[in-house]
From Swiss-Prot:
Protein name: Preterminal protein
Family: Belongs to the adenoviridae terminal protein family.
The entry's keywords: Covalent protein-DNA linkage, DNA replication, DNA-binding, Host nucleus, Phosphoprotein, Viral DNA replication
Motif (Nuclear localization signal): 328-337
Basic and acidic residues bias (residue ranges): 341-350
Annotated function: Protein covalently bound to the viral DNA that acts as a primer for viral genomic replication by DNA strand displacement. Assembles on the viral origin of replication in an initiation complex with viral polymerase, DBP, host NFIA and host POU2F1/OCT1. The terminal protein stimulates the template activity over 20 fold compared to protein-free templates. Neo-synthesized viral genomes are linked to two preterminal proteins, one for each 5' end.
UniProt KW Phosphoprotein keyword: yes
Sites marked Cleavage: L177, G178, G285, A286
Taxonomy of the source species: Viruses, Varidnaviria, Bamfordvirae, Preplasmiviricota, Tectiliviricetes
Protein's gene: PTP
Quaternary structure, from the entry: Heterodimer with the polymerase; this heterodimer binds to bp 9 to 18 of the genome. Interacts with host POU2F1; POU2F1 binds to the auxiliary sequences in the inverted terminal repeats and tethers the pTP-POL heterodimer to the origin DNA thereby participating in the assembly of the pre-initiation complex (POL-TP-DBP-NFIA-POU2F1).
Entry-annotated residues carrying O-(5'-phospho-DNA)-serine: S549
Locations listed in the record: Host nucleus matrix
One example of a Gene Ontology biological process annotation: viral DNA strand displacement replication
Amino acid sequence: MATRQIEAWHRLTGQRPQTLRYFMMTTDLNNRRILRQRTASEAGIRWASRYFEYPVTQLLDLRPFGPVTRNPPFEGEPPPNLLVGYYYVMKAINAYLFDQRTVSNISYNLQLALATNERAMVWQVLTDSSYSIDTGAFSRALDGNTEDLGGTVVQIQNAVMMDRVLTSLTVTPVRGLGAVVREQNNNGIAAFTVRPNFPQARVSKRDATLLRNICECKKALINYITWSPCPPLPCQLDLPFNDGWVEDFVRHFSSASPMENNSQNLVGDFAAVMTMGKQAGMRGGALTLRSGTQTGLPMRLRQREGRRAVTATMRRRRGQAVQSFIDSLPIRRRRRRGTRRQVEREDSVREPPSPGEGPSGIRAPEEEEESFSDDVGLSREDDRADFNQEVVDTIGQLIEELERELNPAAEESGFFNFSQRMYGLLLQLQRENRLTFQMILTWLSNFFVLEHLASTLFYLNEQFVRNGLARRNIGLQFAQVILRGRSDTGRELYTRVWYNREREAFHTLYDRIVTDFIAVTEMADTETMFQAPEEREQLLADMQYVENSGSVDEVIAQLQTRAQQTDSVELSFRIKFSGLVGYSQNPVIQRSFERTREAAIGRWRRQQQQ
């Protein structure tokens, strides 16, 4: 038997190579050595599956006279069958941080190819895996602590930020915001802290360092933005320090507290910063949500040197400052791969925007015309806004570069472009003057639900579609995603269902769910009850509704449920897998099975006679 085939079966069945060689496995039912085996029929394989408890024993070490096969119902030999791919499926499902997993009984079907007369036995199993996200943490924090909103945002950052950036890594999947919240619910929202156990999560020291720095950069940026419209801080901070000013900036502002100002502005800025990164496709220049208001400077600028303006100097040296920060970290840089065109595209993305570009539309003044005052640093409103925007652009690029050092497979997969679409919706709502507190809360809640959905579907796609061995040997009969919104009493508020039978089911489901959520989020402030047929038809058209995707009434129920009412969201992933049944050609194993079967039937008959 070929070594390559043994290695493939080892990964699919979990059995040792020595056991597989001893087993002499084949999946061809026309093989003369197994043509008349009792398990070659559906009735026979079902009996063997029940008697030897295949759902459990197929996950164990079945080597001859091993710890498992020495005990009944075995007689020292492996069972006559191995379920090719079953072990792989169970291992992949168990490796993900689901809260609950349910596996159905294994069913068997005999398949016959009429054209070639090939026969094979196929196993099938339905898995249902789920976890919960505590979306109510947002509304509990924001709605109940409006008097201390600055402190509340700090709590949200501490409770959510690390959970947020872990989804960018995708090495170890995240269970959801609920995991962070549940650990500290007994102490209340004010007790939120972040102490991620990276070794337990199987995150390397390198990635742990990157994740912590991404966290610090985002905290520094949200604090800087919330302080920007305000007078300088009591302790004056000289900027831009030196060519390595980014390190001092992150160190200073990550330890500061957000300014307590308008709640909608604060939460909106927080939501925007949270979407920053390579997967969001968002540049720092897009962060000016309130045109013309971010004009203050929470620090003192140093005077121009050699008649060179500070902002223009920072813009020219932005890339150098970003790289200097990353080079200062105790990590080995990832070697970039890709075509020449991809490298050129990345370089163009990292190029600082020219003056006047971006939503702010503020043109940078000429260097010789930029003026400063001794105390504040910049005298003109446009100059201060331009400087602020350059700081945001620089930190935004730094976040993007840090995330580039993480797992590149997530960016290439296409499973994380929802951030860009959701952020685009946020800007659209702002332009339409619809960015109310309720809308922001709904957007933020839906964003995190989408993030966990994307992370899970990305993982499943990598395991069962992108993996060549799994794709060739494991069938994907259908995939279904079920979302249940619950109140704080556990009452079910709405249930959403998405279903697909294609081989690329996970990617198809992802695209449909993102489009669905965009439409639901955009309509969150609507007052219509969707009673008129034309209103329902328009709603379904906007969502690109597909049959077998749940009741239309449930869609409307989700729309009419306020974010504060949804305390938690349960995400369930139901997948039906299939694979071939392997048969042993070893006559020793075959004779052992016949003896075991005859003994079992004899015991059953004696029990019937008593």
